[in-house]
């Protein structure tokens, strides 16, 4: 499902109105027919479509991400999948005011980059990587990763953001990232570790164990890589549940 199939970013259009449009054959901006809705709302939708096309031509999905509920921002993904950045961080604890970010991994376009505290993890590097991304995807990043980065590095993360935790809940996929991976059949190439293990590995590295850093980095990188198939799974499932279910009679 693409942004061009969506109407709920328009002020005054909820899921019920959007479904009515789809059921009446208006499944894409190109097919918009104002007679399905009132004249005032039709004018608003036409303005939205005109402005929306201009944003999409620039590869900018930010107005749509801002207008969509957190559980519906997955709709932005297909338009900018090649420029999507999957991000995960590891830290020394849960309180950004007194703990540190130890590693940050970003997966985009088939390439994974990892930055390490006291080596190459800087605000400038993070800002450069995020500026090159059209969409940010995390798991629980809205409450954890993004606020942690903003506090520890004094940066503003303004990239349109899909936190997979919310659409996963919409699909009944509860629990942490690794539990959901197991449930839908995403495999990992290494033993499963926890956030507590990540803290332990960092402290072991600080005590001189380089192997612990290697394990920590690979754990962090696996989190970001595995978010891509999870994003694809979520987008496919919700496309079926939300869009195809409403248009099945067309």
Regions found by a protein language model. Give the residues of each.
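Acidic, Mg2+-coordinating catalytic module of metal-dependent nucleases/exonucleases
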Residues: 183-250
